[in-house]
Design a protein with these regions (language model features):
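Transmembrane helix-loop junctions in multi-pass membrane proteins
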Residues: 31-36, 80-85, 162-174, 197-211, ...
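Extracellular/periplasmic helix-exit of transmembrane alpha-helices
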Residues: 112-126, 228-244, 252, 256-259, ...
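Selective recognition of specific alpha-helical transmembrane segments in multi-pass small-molecule
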Residues: 106-114, 191-205, 216-236, 269, ...
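Membrane-interface loop-to-helix entry segments
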Residues: 20-27, 32-44, 154, 171-178, ...
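Helix-loop-helix module between adjacent transmembrane segments
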Residues: 24, 28-29, 103-127, 138-172, ...
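Flexible loop linkers connecting adjacent transmembrane helices
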Residues: 34-63, 87-97, 109-145, 330-347, ...
């Protein structure tokens, strides 16, 4: 089973998806005149514009821009930053980190476009504001039958990729971390995480927004601080770590007969795959949060959205990678969260393992909340609000099952379903690009940007 899924992913995550993802990012970068550079400062200035620690702004009409940002980051900053960075390094070498940066830079333009479209096409479903790629995919080709099929395909893929398999990955990493740090059975961990998740799920959008708004800034800030401390401790290896990243990304051993050899192919495959799983640009996941932000203009949420990719990949994921690469503990036998824990343990002792276990619990659990929410938007699209309670129970079951499965199989399945989401979303982004560009340009003229 594992080998079969891995073979499909090798084909799926080969040149086609890589070209689609990076190509779309390059396309929007050029069309929007390097929007990720031009509007970076603007996006940062909007980050805390309407912060509400009590989550009072979240209701059936949506949530505040900051809460949408926090929900998006909650989904992005998870095992993709901790276990995913380690998996990328082991599977694709240090060079995979470089390709994460490349995909993230162009992904900032992609997610800017996703946020604008999700805002433009959000709607009320049975009295509640909702939105996401399925809603703008449906607008393709004059709302033809084909566009409806693509929208349904995306919605189903999203529910499977995030609500079920994706959350299984998060639970799997939590279970492995808790077993390594505290020798707690994955069955116990799975049950606890499922019940805690259910508590938030059944609280609706207000409880979700309140949770992410409070937890995300605290957990990300503390994690960044600890990473910086470890990198300072390992300062003598920092230059070597960057050398390994850049040299491995373009290793001469990779050139074979005019084609990319296995070295660079693996670095790109795992770098882009893990990069997507981490920052989610182009996947079509975070637009569900950005869609329901209460903003005056769709572009305002686009400005905020591109900052989320920067925080996720260029800050959190990069710091994780540097901790691993400067620790000198990788021998090829450690994978996933175990490698990350050992890197922290090398600098901080056993307390490093404890810290990663606790950090991963909060990172992954917040991602579970975010991904549940994204899946719920597609449940509403396909079946209406009547199916939400059944979906909540099934996600809780997926969390419990995911916590007890082998990490390789769960990761490979997540890659597969993530890829299935990408295709219809990128088709919509390309077809609707004129709308994105015109909306962005109008805003820029109005604000002299």
């Amino acid at each position: 089973m594992l080998n079969f899924i891995a073979s499909i992913n090798e084909l799926f995550w080969g040149a086609i998806l890589i070209l689609l993802l990076v190509g779309t990012g390059i396309f929007y970068t050029l069309k929007l005149k390097f929007v990720q550079v031009r509007k970076f400062k603007k996006g940062v200035s909007q980050l805390t514009g309407d912060f509400d620690i009590n989550g009072k702004d979240a209701d059936h009409n949506g949530m505040s821009s900051f809460q949408a940002l926090a929900t998006a980051i909650a989904a992005q900053v998870g095992t993709g930053n901790l276990a995913g960075a380690a998996t990328a390094i082991v599977s694709g070498g240090p060079g995979a980190i470089f390709w994460m940066w490349v995909s993230a830079f162009f992904g900032m333009a992609t997610i800017y476009a996703e946020a604008i479209l999700s805002q433009l096409f959000k709607r009320k479903v049975e009295g509640e504001v909702t939105g996401g790629p399925a809603y703008y995919i449906e607008e393709l080709f004059n709302k033809s039958f084909l566009s409806k099929i693509l929208a349904i395909f995306f919605a189903l893929s999203c529910i499977l990729a995030l609500g079920f398999m994706g959350n299984g990955v998060q639970a799997n990493s939590i279970g492995e971390a808790m077993k390594n740090a505290f020798n707690i059975s994955p069955y116990i961990t799975g049950a606890v995480v499922a019940l805690l998740g259910g508590f938030v799920f059944f609280g609706g959008v207000k409880r979700i927004a309140s949770f992410t708004e409070k937890v995300v800034p605290l957990m990300a800030g503390l994690y960044i601080l600890i990473c910086l401390i470890i990198i300072v401790i390992n300062y003598s290896n920092v230059i070597k770590a960057f050398e390994a990243i850049f040299v491995n990304a373009f290793s001469m051993k990779s050139i074979l007969g005019g084609f990319l050899g296995m070295g660079v192919k693996k670095a790109i495959r795992y770098g882009v795959a893990r990069g997507l799983f981490s920052n989610e640009a182009g996947m079509g996941s975070t637009p569900h949060a950005h869609a329901i932000a209460k903003v005056k203009n769709p572009v305002e949420q686009g400005n905020v959205a591109l900052i989320t990719v920067f925080i996720d990949t260029f800050i959190v994921l990069t710091l994780t990678a540097l901790v691993i690469l400067t620790s000198n503990i990788g021998d090829g036998t450690l994978t996933g969260i175990t490698l990350t824990q050992k890197a922290f343990e090398a600098a901080l002792g056993y307390s490093g393992t404890i810290f990663i276990a606790v950090a991963l619990f909060f990172f992954a659990f917040s991602t579970i909340i975010g991904w549940y929410f994204f899946g719920e938007a597609n449940i509403k699209y396909l079946f209406g609000k009547k199916a939400i309670n059944a979906y909540r129970i099934l996600v809780m079951l997926a969390i419990f099952i995911g916590a007890t499965q082998k990490v390789e199989l769960v990761w490979e399945l997540a890659d597969l379903f993530n890829g299935l989401m990408v295709i219809p979303n990128l088709i919509a982004l390309i077809v609707l690009y004129k709308l994105v560009v015109s909306t962005s340009n109008e805003y820029d003229k109005l604000h002299n940007l």
